[in-house]
């Protein structure tokens, strides 16, 4: 059962300008420690590092849309974090207000699955999020 679908498309150059202007203040406000660490591993290639941030920014926007709130009503940027499963597949971890919203939307007795697709092709980055409620054990 699909709970929500969200998508977002962002210009990577826009993210680069915000990082240039606000630096760590922006990065610390928007991204989780794990997301910043992922981008830091790509620091030797500035375009790749900025694209990493842009894809994660788009994922947060898409996830907030799938939750039906956008970035408001107690759902904040750092409540949504992009993680990679052991297989390499990207997914999202929700905390705080985003997790509370997800719990409100999830029917009793079902588990949540968050599918995430990320892509970039300079100068654009895109994310799609599908949040589903599934029978336990069918993740």
From Swiss-Prot:
One of its GO terms (molecular function) is magnesium ion binding. The keyword Kinase does not apply. Keywords: Cytoplasm, Fatty acid biosynthesis, Fatty acid metabolism, Lipid biosynthesis, Lipid metabolism, Magnesium, Metal-binding, Transferase. One of its GO terms (cellular component) is cytoplasm. Its EC number is 2.7.8.7. InterPro entries: 4-PPantetheinyl_Trfase_dom, 4-PPantetheinyl_Trfase_dom_sf, ACPS, Ppantetheine-prot_Trfase_dom. Its main location: cytoplasm. HAMAP family: AcpS. NCBIfam families: acpS, pantethn_trn. This is Holo-[acyl-carrier-protein] synthase.
């Amino acid at each position: 059962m699909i709970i929500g679908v969200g998508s977002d498309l962002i210009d990577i150059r826009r993210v680069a300008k915000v990082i240039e202007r606000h630096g760590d203040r922006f990065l610390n406000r928007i991204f989780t420690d794990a997301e910043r660490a992922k981008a830091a591993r790509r620091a030797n290639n500035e375009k790749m590092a900025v694209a990493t941030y842009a894809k994660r920014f788009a994922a947060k926007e898409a996830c907030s849309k799938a939750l039906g709130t956008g970035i408001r009503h107690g759902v904040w940027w750092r409540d949504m974090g992009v993680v990679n499963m052991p297989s390499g597949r990207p997914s999202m971890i929700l905390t705080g207000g985003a997790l509370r919203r997800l719990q409100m939307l999830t029917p009793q007795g079902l588990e949540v699955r968050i599918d995430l697709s990320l892509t970039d092709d300079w100068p654009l980055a895109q994310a799609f999020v599908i949040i589903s409620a599934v029978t336990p054990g069918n993740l």
